[in-house]
């Protein structure tokens, strides 16, 4: 697992994402819709829906928006979405995984390929970069929200089944096996911890530093991918120079 903080990357792009909040809500609504279609409207018996609702709350998505997405998914008919994963290399050989939810594979594939090509990258075959990432549960607790002793919190996380706890000045980052993620999340919430973030994600085993002369090209690629309405998540094995973040 890379030693570079995933939370650092999340916070580093927060302002840009805030400006795209409407699109983020639209994507999460689509993910909630698909989760309800697949497993029903009750999050207690639909783990994927619970995960998407947690994601919605973490993004400060209004409750009315969440309810509308659940109600829409509970109705008959509607679009059929398919989850597709693309893998490729950005400028300077940075590994990138793109997760998309689409009702038109040809449209999405063309747009993703164009983004990579336009910004000096290349779209690869399935498996070309995914081996560089590990599927992990990822939970964040802010120091500001911590009411307990730090050692007690770390012990609670490990006892709940976490694989690793990393600390920084601002947060505790808790990593779990994907199969243990829900159990660890629920155990920590049951003990009264406030979770700043909780998700299943892809963690790079190593990260490539993007050279300064490639930063604009690289961030342009990530921005174009994230601006695509069909794209749900972009996972990066890259670190930007501090003055570029």
UniProtKB/Swiss-Prot annotation:
GO terms for cellular component: cytosol. Pfam families: TACO1_YebC_N, Transcrip_reg. The keyword DNA-binding applies. GO terms for biological process: regulation of DNA-templated transcription. Keywords: Cytoplasm, DNA-binding, Transcription, Transcription regulation. It is found in: Cytoplasm. The keyword Transcription regulation applies. One of its GO terms (molecular function) is DNA binding. It comes from the Bacteria. Its main location: cytoplasm. Coiled coil: none annotated. Residues 1-21 are annotated as: Disordered. InterPro entries: Integrase-like_N (IPR017856), TACO1_YebC-like_2nd/3rd_dom (IPR048300), TACO1_YebC_N (IPR049083), Transcrip_reg_TACO1-like (IPR002876), Transcrip_reg_TACO1-like_dom3 (IPR026564), YebC-like (IPR029072). Belongs to the TACO1 family. PANTHER family: TRANSCRIPTIONAL REGULATORY PROTEIN YEBC-RELATED, TRANSLATIONAL ACTIVATOR OF CYTOCHROME C OXIDASE 1. HAMAP family: Transcrip_reg_TACO1. This is Probable transcriptional regulatory protein PEPE_1240.
